[in-house]
Amino acid sequence: MTQTESAILAHARRCAPAESCGFVISTPEGEWYIPCVNISAEPEAYFRIAPEDWLRAEMQGEIVALVHSHPGGLPWLSEADRRLQIKSALPWWLVCRGDIHKFRCVPHLTGRRFEHGVTDCYTLFRDAYHLAGTEMPDFHREDDWWRNDQNLYLDNMAVTGFYRVPLSSAQAGDILLCCFGASVP
């Protein structure tokens, strides 16, 4: 555990049962945690950072993550957290049950415009699993790989630990791959 992570966890413990909040900044000397005061009117359910604290963090270094906690809550970002994360365009680190969960900023899962290798089918389920706490590696995808006897989705998902199940055994959280206009999913 890094010194930054230790400082984040200590701040969350001190603030509980209220949500803690702060920033991770990067400076030439390294990464640091800047704790902030939660100015929310309901600090046990929400967090709010004063604009002055945000400016203070920006003046001390490059903000690389926004941090807050869910004391007694769940280890993933709420719907409101996700909306605010997208507006901030920052990774968010969430303290929950003594652990730090790191969420990169991903666009909303619905309403995306398809762009091969950027917001394609693999990116969609990679982002969905990331939001649920499971990391999947990204991989390079050449255009038209499906026309060159490659099956990148199935091959790369197997490396990540996914495996094929009969449709009759499918359950929530499984991925369904379909072929539309191609011979491979």
Predicted feature locations:
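...with weaker cross-activation on analogous glycine-rich loops/strands in unrelated enzymes
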Residues: 144-185
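Short gly/pro-enriched beta-turn/loop segments at secondary-structure junctions
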Residues: 16-18, 109, 119-123, 171
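Glycine-rich catalytic cores of cysteine/serine-nucleophile enzymes that process amide/ester linkages
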Residues: 107-119, 177-185
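Short acidic alpha-helical/loop segments enriched in Asp/Glu that coordinate divalent cations
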Residues: 134-146
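Active-site nucleophilic cysteine motif
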Residues: 115-132
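Short helix-to-loop capping/linker segments positioned immediately adjacent to catalytic or ligand/cofactor-binding
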Residues: 10-14, 109-116, 164
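Short His-Asn-centered micro-motif
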Residues: 67-69, 178-179
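Conserved beta-strand-loop surface patch within small alpha/beta domains used
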Residues: 1-65, 71-104
